[in-house]
Curated annotation (Swiss-Prot):
Pfam families: Ribosomal_S11. Signal peptide: none annotated. It comes from Bartonella bacilliformis (strain ATCC 35685 / KC583 / Herrer 020/F12,63). This is Small ribosomal subunit protein uS11. Part of the 30S ribosomal subunit. Interacts with proteins S7 and S18. Binds to IF-3.
Amino acid sequence: MAKEAKRVRRSERKNISSSVVHINSTFNNTMITITDSQGDTIAWSSAGAQGFKGSRKSTPFAAQVAAADCAKKAEEHGVRSLEVEVCGPGSGRESALRALQSAGFIITSIRDVTPIPHNGCRPRKRRRV
């Protein structure tokens, strides 16, 4: 029997005017996800997906490149205004935000949603360099 050809699911163009940007900036990488108001992903990118490897992923420039790529993908879906949610302690937070602003989006709000423990779990041991 002949193999059935795989169907490639093509992402149809959604017409979304406002959306939410989640910038997750860790010490090792920066992930940017653009979702609609329900939380369905429109576009995503990360420093690692842009070809940065190792310690270069954690740089502000890598976050800027990832944010610019994500903005280009979101523009194809008609996104104009953004709400920004920033999470994590990494170095790519501000540069990713600046890259989204320079891409021509209207930023309506910026929220820091970094989880802060109220004396919860014991933290990992301190690094001694």
